[in-house]
Amino acid sequence: TLVSMSDEEFPREYCGWWRIIESSLWGSADIDIAGPALISMTGYDDRLRMFVLLAYLKCNPTKAGVSFTWQGAWEYDPVSGTGSVRLRKDGCISGRIKIKNGEESTFVAKRTAEPDEPIPDPPSYRDKWRQRW
């Protein structure tokens, strides 16, 4: 788990849960294939779920918004990367997510409530092989 900072240091306008509603590279048809596409930004134990990506985030405020590093799994493949978000005039956030040595996409998210079910931990290859036997 990546841990960021105390709640007092995290900008209130970004703090909370956000529902990802658009993605430039991967489209929007399958955005919820692993469950509702979400990003949490609180400065502590933050998560990302989009398509088949499950990841832990480490968020840091910047002058322009919030930047983050992340690590997790794309299906069962370990992946990591970076990203950033900025608040728009309409109250949504615009973001960018980049997979290390891979693709990059922009996204749009709107504020939402914390999900009833937590975002699961990213799976590992061990989990993949357990399911086959």
Give the predicted meaning of each segment:
Residues 2-14, 19-23, 62, 90-92, ...:
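Edge beta-strand at a domain terminus
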Residues 8, 17-20, 28-65:
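N-terminal glycine/threonine-rich, aromatic-flanked beta-hairpin/loop signature
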Residues 23-26, 73:
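Short beta-turn/strand-loop junction motif enriched in small, turn-promoting residues
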Residues 33-36, 53-56, 78-82, 102-106:
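Short, surface-exposed coil-to-beta transition loops
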Residues 47-52, 67-74, 95-98:
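Short beta-strand segments that buttress and anchor functional surface loops
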Residues 37-49, 89-92, 128-133:
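A short, hydrophobic secondary-structure junction motif
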Residues 59-89:
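Mid-chain, well-packed structural core segment of small domains
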